[in-house]
């Protein structure tokens, strides 16, 4: 409402924050300097731990940002307690002192207390997910980590299916949603009944919003929404409609505190307004140094303050708070 907008503006003025608060592409973006120490500008994954620290997975190491500075972790040849692989594909954690990493060569655990890495599993792993337990996907099998034995126990085998899992999500009814690289999405109920709500596509991500709807990003099939009653909507790019989703290559979704859904795609950042059903596009622009650093968005996460953090393919980390529409970001250094 207009009253809310005026209140927010007054609040911003009260804080002496200078920001041009306009919609769309005309938002003023602020940014951090290039010397923050991000190990590499291609960000595959972001994770926020229980202390609000941002973990950043890149092609060349793991980074930890505490709000002031960045510490990088990389492979050290003769150190068994170091990170065993520099390419960090996915990050998750147990919100209780442990961070789990999916790397090109397997799965690692970082213990915040000892500040040491431990290799949990070596070899090719396709998916990682944490919800009370650590789950991984390898080809057509799901395993759960057993902390007593330090082994991964088989949880489910998609028998007779020559597929590769790509992502996992456990909903509150204990349904395990399994995204694949070619066969869409399978759903395994708590009593191990298997269904296949989406039958085709390479699935990039599965996200559950506050109203328990699932938002599923795919490589070429656009964005899927699975409503709580089971109805499935598919959003596709329409070149004739500027308010359609900007790309059919959808990598990530995240809901802000206002109830809008932010969608990271190959061609830009979309904001989806559930009330109007319209998508608004934000892209990088060389003429706007205070804009997004890169239009290709890999991952989005939200912190306790409602700030959204974006990992980009070629522009480091961007972050902003939609409630104030002030944008800041890490910028790629010229030296990289």
Question: What residue ranges belong to the model's regions?
Answer:
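Carboxylate-rich, polar loop motifs that coordinate divalent cations or form catalytic acidic clusters
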Residues: 1-336
């Amino acid at each position: 409402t207009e009253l809310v907008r005026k209140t927010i503006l007054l609040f911003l003025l009260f804080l002496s924050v200078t920001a041009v608060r306009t919609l769309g592409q005309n938002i003023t973006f602020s940014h951090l300097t290039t010397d923050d120490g991000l190990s590499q500008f291609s960000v595959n994954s972001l994770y926020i731990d229980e202390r609000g620290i941002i973990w950043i997975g890149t092609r060349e190491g793991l980074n930890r940002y505490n709000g002031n500075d960045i510490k990088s972790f990389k492979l050290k040849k003769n150190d068994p307690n170091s990170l065993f692989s520099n390419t960090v594909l996915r990050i998750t954690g147990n919100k209780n002192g442990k961070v789990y990493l999916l790397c090109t060569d397997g799965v690692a655990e970082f213990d915040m207390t000892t500040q040491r890495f431990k290799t949990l599993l070596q070899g090719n792993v396709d998916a990682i997910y944490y919800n009370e337990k650590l789950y991984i996907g390898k080809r057509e099998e799901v395993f759960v980590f057993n902390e007593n034995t330090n082994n991964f126990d088989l949880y489910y085998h998609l028998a007779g299916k020559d597929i590769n899992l790509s992502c996992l999500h456990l909903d509150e009814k204990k349904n395990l949603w399994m995204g694949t690289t070619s066969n869409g999405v399978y759903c395994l109920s708590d009593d191990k009944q298997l269904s296949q709500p989406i039958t085709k596509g390479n699935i990039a991500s599965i996200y559950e919003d506050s109203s328990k709807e699932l938002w599923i990003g795919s490589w070429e099939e656009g964005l899927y929404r699975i409503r709580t009653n089971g109805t499935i909507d598919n959003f596709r790019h329409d070149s004739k409609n500027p308010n359609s989703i900007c790309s059919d290559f959808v990598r990530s979704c995240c809901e802000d505190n206002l109830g809008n859904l932010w969608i990271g795609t190959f061609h830009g950042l979309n904001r989806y307004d559930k009330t109007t059903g319209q998508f608004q596009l934000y892209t990088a622009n060389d003429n706007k140094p205070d804009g997004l650093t890169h239009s290709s968005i890999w991952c989005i996460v939200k912190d306790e303050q409602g700030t959204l953090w974006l990992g980009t393919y070629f522009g480091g980390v961007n972050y902003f708070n939609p409630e104030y529409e002030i944008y800041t970001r890490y910028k790629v250094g010229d030296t990289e």
